Protein backbone atom coordinates (compact mmCIF):
# COMPACT_ATOMS: atom_id res chain seq x y z
CA UNK A 1 0.00 0.00 0.00
CA UNK A 2 2.82 2.37 0.86
CA UNK A 3 4.41 1.73 -2.53
CA UNK A 4 1.14 2.54 -4.31
CA UNK A 5 0.82 5.82 -2.42
CA UNK A 6 4.39 6.77 -3.28
CA UNK A 7 3.86 6.06 -6.97
CA UNK A 8 0.61 8.05 -7.00
CA UNK A 9 2.46 10.99 -5.50
CA UNK A 10 5.06 10.77 -8.27
CA UNK A 11 2.47 10.37 -11.04
CA UNK A 12 0.38 13.23 -9.69
CA UNK A 13 3.35 15.55 -9.67
CA UNK A 14 4.15 14.91 -13.34
CA UNK A 15 1.11 16.83 -14.60
CA UNK A 16 2.18 19.97 -12.74
CA UNK A 17 5.93 19.98 -13.03
CA UNK A 18 6.03 20.54 -16.82
CA UNK A 19 4.58 24.02 -16.36
CA UNK A 20 7.44 24.96 -14.04
CA UNK A 21 10.39 23.98 -16.18
CA UNK A 22 10.40 27.30 -18.01
CA UNK A 23 11.10 29.12 -14.77
CA UNK A 24 13.89 26.87 -13.62
CA UNK A 25 16.88 27.81 -15.73
CA UNK A 26 18.30 30.68 -17.69
CA UNK A 27 19.88 29.51 -20.96
CA UNK A 28 23.16 31.30 -20.35
CA UNK A 29 24.81 28.35 -18.64
CA UNK A 30 27.52 27.02 -20.96
CA UNK A 31 28.99 27.71 -24.37
CA UNK A 32 28.58 24.13 -25.64
CA UNK A 33 26.57 23.50 -28.79
CA UNK A 34 25.08 20.24 -27.51
CA UNK A 35 22.34 19.90 -24.91
CA UNK A 36 21.59 17.20 -22.37
CA UNK A 37 18.86 16.73 -19.78
CA UNK A 38 19.79 16.40 -16.13
CA UNK A 39 18.18 12.94 -16.20
CA UNK A 40 20.45 11.78 -19.03
CA UNK A 41 23.47 13.38 -17.38
CA UNK A 42 22.90 11.42 -14.18
CA UNK A 43 22.22 8.21 -16.10
CA UNK A 44 25.36 8.54 -18.20
CA UNK A 45 27.50 9.31 -15.15
CA UNK A 46 26.36 6.15 -13.35
CA UNK A 47 26.72 4.07 -16.53
CA UNK A 48 30.27 5.25 -17.19
CA UNK A 49 31.39 4.72 -13.60
CA UNK A 50 29.87 1.22 -13.53
CA UNK A 51 31.65 0.45 -16.79
CA UNK A 52 34.98 1.76 -15.49
CA UNK A 53 34.86 0.14 -12.04
CA UNK A 54 33.30 -3.29 -11.36
CA UNK A 55 33.01 -2.39 -7.67
CA UNK A 56 30.29 0.19 -8.43
CA UNK A 57 26.71 -1.07 -8.14
CA UNK A 58 23.23 0.45 -7.82
CA UNK A 59 20.51 -0.41 -5.34
CA UNK A 60 17.12 0.99 -4.36
CA UNK A 61 13.40 0.72 -4.88
CA UNK A 62 12.45 0.02 -8.52
CA UNK A 63 15.91 0.88 -9.88
CA UNK A 64 16.06 -2.31 -11.95
CA UNK A 65 13.06 -3.60 -13.89
CA UNK A 66 11.16 -0.30 -13.60
CA UNK A 67 14.41 1.59 -14.39
CA UNK A 68 13.95 4.00 -11.51
CA UNK A 69 10.98 6.06 -10.39
CA UNK A 70 12.42 8.94 -12.46
CA UNK A 71 14.23 6.73 -15.03
CA UNK A 72 17.68 7.72 -13.81
CA UNK A 73 18.78 4.06 -13.94
CA UNK A 74 17.30 3.42 -17.39
CA UNK A 75 19.06 0.61 -19.24
CA UNK A 76 21.42 -0.32 -16.42
CA UNK A 77 19.77 -3.63 -15.47
CA UNK A 78 19.87 -4.83 -19.06
CA UNK A 79 23.52 -3.81 -19.43
CA UNK A 80 24.95 -4.90 -16.07
CA UNK A 81 22.51 -7.52 -14.81
CA UNK A 82 20.85 -8.11 -11.43
CA UNK A 83 24.22 -8.69 -9.74
CA UNK A 84 24.97 -4.95 -10.01
CA UNK A 85 21.50 -3.39 -10.20
CA UNK A 86 19.50 -4.45 -7.15
CA UNK A 87 15.77 -3.91 -6.76
CA UNK A 88 15.04 -3.66 -3.04
CA UNK A 89 11.91 -3.94 -0.91
CA UNK A 90 10.35 -0.76 0.47
CA UNK A 91 12.65 -0.70 3.49
CA UNK A 92 15.10 2.19 3.44
CA UNK A 93 16.65 1.20 6.76
CA UNK A 94 17.32 -2.29 5.43
CA UNK A 95 18.85 -1.58 2.05
CA UNK A 96 20.81 1.46 3.29
CA UNK A 97 22.39 -0.69 5.98
CA UNK A 98 23.28 -3.30 3.36
CA UNK A 99 24.82 -0.56 1.22
CA UNK A 100 26.96 0.75 4.08
CA UNK A 101 28.10 -2.80 4.87
CA UNK A 102 29.06 -3.32 1.24
CA UNK A 103 31.07 -0.08 1.34
CA UNK A 104 32.87 -1.34 4.46
CA UNK A 105 33.89 -4.36 2.38
CA UNK A 106 35.35 -2.18 -0.39
CA UNK A 107 32.46 -2.01 -2.84
CA UNK A 108 31.04 1.30 -4.09
CA UNK A 109 27.25 1.36 -3.71
CA UNK A 110 25.05 4.03 -5.27
CA UNK A 111 21.92 3.98 -3.11
CA UNK A 112 18.80 5.62 -4.56
CA UNK A 113 16.05 7.06 -2.39
CA UNK A 114 12.77 7.61 -4.21
CA UNK A 115 12.81 10.93 -2.37
CA UNK A 116 15.17 12.15 0.33
CA UNK A 117 12.19 12.44 2.64
CA UNK A 118 12.36 8.64 2.87
CA UNK A 119 16.02 8.79 3.88
CA UNK A 120 14.72 9.63 7.35
CA UNK A 121 13.96 5.92 7.65
CA UNK A 122 17.68 5.25 7.20
CA UNK A 123 19.28 8.22 8.92
CA UNK A 124 20.93 6.04 11.59
CA UNK A 125 22.92 4.20 8.93
CA UNK A 126 23.77 7.39 7.02
CA UNK A 127 25.03 9.31 10.05
CA UNK A 128 26.05 6.81 12.73
CA UNK A 129 27.41 4.15 10.38
CA UNK A 130 28.55 5.85 7.15
CA UNK A 131 29.57 9.32 8.32
CA UNK A 132 31.36 8.42 11.55
CA UNK A 133 33.21 5.22 10.72
CA UNK A 134 36.33 6.78 9.23
CA UNK A 135 36.83 8.97 12.30
CA UNK A 136 35.98 6.25 14.81
CA UNK A 137 38.40 3.81 13.14
CA UNK A 138 41.26 6.35 13.13
CA UNK A 139 41.14 6.42 9.33
CA UNK A 140 41.29 2.65 8.87
CA UNK A 141 37.78 2.36 7.39
CA UNK A 142 36.59 4.25 4.33
CA UNK A 143 32.94 4.23 3.34
CA UNK A 144 32.76 4.95 -0.43
CA UNK A 145 28.99 5.19 -0.79
CA UNK A 146 26.65 7.62 -2.56
CA UNK A 147 23.15 8.35 -1.31
CA UNK A 148 21.21 9.99 -4.14
CA UNK A 149 17.67 10.98 -5.10
CA UNK A 150 15.31 13.96 -5.44
CA UNK A 151 15.33 16.52 -2.64
CA UNK A 152 13.08 19.47 -1.86
CA UNK A 153 9.77 20.60 -3.30
CA UNK A 154 8.37 19.15 -6.51
CA UNK A 155 4.80 20.03 -7.49
CA UNK A 156 1.83 19.27 -5.27
CA UNK A 157 3.23 16.25 -3.45
CA UNK A 158 2.60 17.48 0.09
CA UNK A 159 4.67 18.04 3.21
CA UNK A 160 6.01 14.49 3.52
CA UNK A 161 7.51 14.52 0.00
CA UNK A 162 8.71 18.13 -0.27
CA UNK A 163 11.30 18.88 2.40
CA UNK A 164 14.83 20.07 1.65
CA UNK A 165 17.48 18.15 3.60
CA UNK A 166 20.55 20.13 2.55
CA UNK A 167 21.03 21.77 5.95
CA UNK A 168 20.33 18.52 7.83
CA UNK A 169 23.07 16.52 6.14
CA UNK A 170 25.48 19.43 5.70
CA UNK A 171 25.69 19.77 9.49
CA UNK A 172 27.22 16.29 9.85
CA UNK A 173 31.02 15.82 9.96
CA UNK A 174 32.09 12.92 7.76
CA UNK A 175 29.53 13.55 5.01
CA UNK A 176 30.00 15.42 1.76
CA UNK A 177 26.83 17.03 0.42
CA UNK A 178 26.40 17.98 -3.24
CA UNK A 179 23.49 19.68 -5.03
CA UNK A 180 23.72 19.94 -8.85
CA UNK A 181 21.85 22.49 -10.94
CA UNK A 182 22.69 21.81 -14.60
CA UNK A 183 23.46 18.74 -16.69
CA UNK A 184 27.17 19.56 -16.46
CA UNK A 185 26.87 19.78 -12.67
CA UNK A 186 24.99 16.49 -12.53
CA UNK A 187 27.53 14.57 -14.63
CA UNK A 188 30.66 16.01 -13.10
CA UNK A 189 29.54 15.96 -9.49
CA UNK A 190 28.00 12.47 -9.55
CA UNK A 191 31.13 10.99 -11.12
CA UNK A 192 33.19 12.74 -8.43
CA UNK A 193 30.87 11.43 -5.73
CA UNK A 194 31.13 7.82 -6.93
CA UNK A 195 34.93 8.04 -7.04
CA UNK A 196 35.20 9.67 -3.61
CA UNK A 197 36.41 7.48 -0.72
CA UNK A 198 33.92 9.02 1.71
CA UNK A 199 30.10 8.96 1.95
CA UNK A 200 28.39 11.53 -0.27
CA UNK A 201 24.81 12.77 -0.02
CA UNK A 202 23.77 13.75 -3.54
CA UNK A 203 20.70 16.01 -3.55
CA UNK A 204 18.93 16.19 -6.90
CA UNK A 205 15.74 18.07 -7.81
CA UNK A 206 12.77 16.40 -9.46
CA UNK A 207 11.81 19.50 -11.43
CA UNK A 208 15.26 19.64 -13.03
CA UNK A 209 15.33 16.06 -14.32
CA UNK A 210 13.64 16.88 -17.63
CA UNK A 211 15.36 20.22 -18.10
CA UNK A 212 17.92 20.46 -20.93
CA UNK A 213 21.14 22.43 -20.57
CA UNK A 214 24.00 23.23 -22.94
CA UNK A 215 26.92 20.92 -22.25
CA UNK A 216 30.53 21.16 -23.38
CA UNK A 217 32.55 18.49 -25.16
CA UNK A 218 34.80 18.37 -22.11
CA UNK A 219 31.85 17.47 -19.88
CA UNK A 220 30.85 14.65 -22.25
CA UNK A 221 34.24 12.96 -21.91
CA UNK A 222 34.19 9.87 -19.70
CA UNK A 223 37.08 11.25 -17.64
CA UNK A 224 35.20 14.46 -16.79
CA UNK A 225 34.88 15.17 -13.09
CA UNK A 226 34.07 18.33 -11.11
CA UNK A 227 35.93 19.15 -7.89
CA UNK A 228 33.97 18.65 -4.69
CA UNK A 229 33.95 21.80 -2.57
CA UNK A 230 34.20 24.30 -5.43
CA UNK A 231 31.38 26.70 -6.34
CA UNK A 232 30.78 28.15 -9.81
CA UNK A 233 30.15 31.78 -10.69
CA UNK A 234 27.25 31.41 -13.13
CA UNK A 235 27.00 35.12 -13.89
CA UNK A 236 29.49 37.85 -13.04
CA UNK A 237 28.34 41.13 -11.52
CA UNK A 238 29.55 44.07 -9.48
CA UNK A 239 26.62 45.36 -7.40
CA UNK A 240 25.27 42.40 -5.41
CA UNK A 241 26.19 38.73 -4.82
CA UNK A 242 23.40 36.13 -4.98
CA UNK A 243 24.37 32.72 -3.56
CA UNK A 244 22.18 29.65 -3.98
CA UNK A 245 22.07 26.02 -5.11
CA UNK A 246 20.01 23.44 -7.04
CA UNK A 247 16.78 24.70 -8.66
CA UNK A 248 17.13 28.13 -7.09
CA UNK A 249 20.15 28.84 -9.32
CA UNK A 250 17.75 29.14 -12.25
CA UNK A 251 15.54 31.49 -10.27
CA UNK A 252 18.57 33.60 -9.32
CA UNK A 253 19.66 33.85 -12.96
CA UNK A 254 16.17 34.98 -13.96
CA UNK A 255 16.22 37.54 -11.15
CA UNK A 256 19.63 38.77 -12.32
CA UNK A 257 18.18 39.37 -15.78
CA UNK A 258 15.38 41.47 -14.31
CA UNK A 259 17.81 43.38 -12.09
CA UNK A 260 19.99 44.15 -15.12
CA UNK A 261 17.01 45.86 -16.73
CA UNK A 262 16.99 48.21 -13.74
CA UNK A 263 20.70 48.88 -13.82
CA UNK A 264 21.75 46.45 -11.06
CA UNK A 265 24.57 44.05 -11.89
CA UNK A 266 24.13 40.80 -9.93
CA UNK A 267 26.76 38.10 -9.50
CA UNK A 268 25.18 34.63 -9.20
CA UNK A 269 27.06 31.84 -7.42
CA UNK A 270 26.01 28.21 -7.84
CA UNK A 271 27.31 26.44 -4.72
CA UNK A 272 27.34 22.94 -6.23
CA UNK A 273 28.85 21.71 -2.95
CA UNK A 274 27.03 22.36 0.35
CA UNK A 275 29.61 20.52 2.43
CA UNK A 276 32.44 21.34 2.04
CA UNK A 277 31.31 24.92 1.45
CA UNK A 278 33.36 27.13 -0.86
CA UNK A 279 33.68 30.03 1.55
CA UNK A 280 36.60 31.52 -0.40
CA UNK A 281 34.56 32.07 -3.58
CA UNK A 282 31.61 33.48 -1.63
CA UNK A 283 33.71 35.91 0.39
CA UNK A 284 35.74 37.02 -2.62
CA UNK A 285 32.54 37.89 -4.44
CA UNK A 286 31.08 39.77 -1.47
CA UNK A 287 34.31 41.75 -1.10
CA UNK A 288 33.82 42.82 -4.71
CA UNK A 289 30.09 43.64 -4.61
CA UNK A 290 29.76 44.60 -0.91
CA UNK A 291 26.28 43.06 -0.77
CA UNK A 292 24.93 39.54 -0.20
CA UNK A 293 21.62 37.80 -0.93
CA UNK A 294 21.26 34.09 -0.12
CA UNK A 295 18.49 31.84 -1.43
CA UNK A 296 17.35 28.33 -0.44
CA UNK A 297 14.12 26.31 -0.40
CA UNK A 298 14.72 24.94 3.08
CA UNK A 299 13.38 26.22 6.37
CA UNK A 300 14.68 29.64 7.48
CA UNK A 301 16.06 28.59 10.87
CA UNK A 302 19.51 26.96 11.03
CA UNK A 303 19.74 26.65 7.26
CA UNK A 304 22.42 26.72 4.56
CA UNK A 305 21.76 30.44 4.07
CA UNK A 306 22.33 31.10 7.76
CA UNK A 307 25.75 29.42 7.57
CA UNK A 308 26.71 31.45 4.50
CA UNK A 309 25.64 34.70 6.15
CA UNK A 310 27.60 33.81 9.28
CA UNK A 311 30.70 33.10 7.20
CA UNK A 312 30.47 36.45 5.41
CA UNK A 313 29.88 38.39 8.63
CA UNK A 314 32.86 36.64 10.24
CA UNK A 315 35.25 37.02 7.32
CA UNK A 316 34.07 40.01 5.26
CA UNK A 317 32.01 42.21 7.58
CA UNK A 318 34.04 45.35 6.92
CA UNK A 319 33.35 45.02 3.18
CA UNK A 320 29.55 45.02 3.55
CA UNK A 321 27.65 48.15 2.54
CA UNK A 322 24.25 46.73 3.55
CA UNK A 323 22.80 44.06 5.84
CA UNK A 324 22.88 40.55 4.39
CA UNK A 325 19.56 39.39 2.90
CA UNK A 326 18.33 35.84 3.52
CA UNK A 327 15.56 34.24 1.42
CA UNK A 328 14.28 30.81 2.45
CA UNK A 329 11.16 28.67 2.42
CA UNK A 330 8.35 29.47 4.83
CA UNK A 331 8.68 28.16 8.39
CA UNK A 332 5.82 25.67 7.89
CA UNK A 333 5.42 22.12 6.56
CA UNK A 334 4.89 22.32 2.80
CA UNK A 335 1.22 22.95 1.88
CA UNK A 336 -0.44 20.70 -0.68
CA UNK A 337 -2.54 23.38 -2.42
CA UNK A 338 -0.69 24.89 -5.39
CA UNK A 339 -1.35 28.50 -4.41
CA UNK A 340 -0.13 27.94 -0.85
CA UNK A 341 2.84 25.89 -2.03
CA UNK A 342 3.97 28.81 -4.17
CA UNK A 343 3.74 31.15 -1.19
CA UNK A 344 5.86 28.74 0.87
CA UNK A 345 8.76 28.74 -1.61
CA UNK A 346 11.15 31.49 -2.76
CA UNK A 347 10.14 33.10 -6.04
CA UNK A 348 12.02 35.18 -8.61
CA UNK A 349 10.33 38.36 -7.43
CA UNK A 350 11.52 37.68 -3.87
CA UNK A 351 15.12 37.60 -5.07
CA UNK A 352 14.63 40.81 -7.05
CA UNK A 353 13.14 42.63 -4.06
CA UNK A 354 15.86 41.46 -1.68
CA UNK A 355 18.60 42.46 -4.12
CA UNK A 356 17.09 45.90 -4.54
CA UNK A 357 16.86 46.32 -0.77
CA UNK A 358 20.53 45.44 -0.49
CA UNK A 359 21.28 48.09 -3.10
CA UNK A 360 19.01 50.62 -1.34
CA UNK A 361 16.66 50.71 -4.31
CA UNK A 362 13.06 51.00 -3.12
CA UNK A 363 11.46 50.69 -6.54
UniProtKB/Swiss-Prot annotation:
* EC number(s) recorded for this UniProt protein: 1.2.4.1
Query: Position(s) of the covalent cross-link Glycyl lysine isopeptide (Lys-Gly) (interchain with G-Cter in ubiquitin)?
Result: 247, 254
Q: Where in the cell is it found?
A: Mitochondrion matrix
Entry cofactors: thiamine diphosphate
Keywords in UniProt for this one? Answer: Isopeptide bond, Metal-binding, Mitochondrion, Oxidoreductase, Potassium, Pyruvate, Thiamine pyrophosphate, Transit peptide, Ubl conjugation
A GO term (biological process) for this protein? Answer: pyruvate decarboxylation to acetyl-CoA
Q: Which Gene3D superfamilies match?
A: 3.40.50.920, 3.40.50.970
Q: Which InterPro entries match?
A: PDHB_mito-type, THDP-binding, Transketo_C/PFOR_II, Transketolase-like_Pyr-bd, Transketolase_C
One example GO MF annotation: pyruvate dehydrogenase (acetyl-transferring) activity
Please indicate which superkingdom the organism of origin belongs to.
Eukaryota
CDD domains annotated for this entry?
Answer: TPP_PYR_E1-PDHc-beta_like
Gene Ontology cellular component annotations, sorted alphabetically: mitochondrial matrix; mitochondrion; nucleolus; plant-type vacuole; plastid
Q: What is the stated purpose of this protein?
A: The pyruvate dehydrogenase complex catalyzes the overall conversion of pyruvate to acetyl-CoA and CO(2). It contains multiple copies of three enzymatic components: pyruvate dehydrogenase (E1), dihydrolipoamide acetyltransferase (E2) and lipoamide dehydrogenase (E3).
UniProt-recorded name of the protein: Pyruvate dehydrogenase E1 component subunit beta-1, mitochondrial
What is the species listed in this Swiss-Prot or TrEMBL entry? Answer: Arabidopsis thaliana (Mouse-ear cress)
